């Protein structure tokens, strides 16, 4: 099984940008955590980050031709603006989980709108880096035919993003 983890604009600045919201851990630490979890799950994973909307669209489209079984997508700011990402997800029809490190429901009102969510299996937010691992687990379960109710998005407090990699698992979004 192959999972593609796609991260949008400014996620390369993790640990620098607003650590009180997004935590003190770096993007490299996130990718390392994801890679280690992939080994535990016996799957392959690719982490990709771009600050450019068109590059993100191309990466989603390329996934269709690369035998990708699932996508973990943190579109970052493009969550709230990008019809192009929505259309790319519609085109490829690869199971996708939308992930956000922070509690997007507690940030500015405009950040509470997701253009991509309707094409995702579910959304996980507020679980810090652990949200990525939860998304990977969910996609593996779906691919292996393990039935789960994944229709309800996360709406409750779970963890403090400032301690994103060590916080206890909170409310499940699946």
Regions found by a protein language model. Name each.
Residues 55-71:
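Short, electropositive alpha-helical surface patch
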Residues 1-3:
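Extreme N-terminal starter segment of soluble prokaryotic enzymes
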Residues 67-105:
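Mid-chain, well-packed structural core segment of small domains
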Residues 47, 97, 106-150:
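Short, glycine-/small-residue-rich phosphate/pyrophosphate-handling segment
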Residues 46-54:
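Short beta->alpha junction loops
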Residues 14-28:
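Glycine- and acidic-residue-enriched helix-capping/strand-helix junction motifs
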Residues 146-173:
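Intrinsically disordered, low-complexity terminal tails and inter-domain linkers enriched
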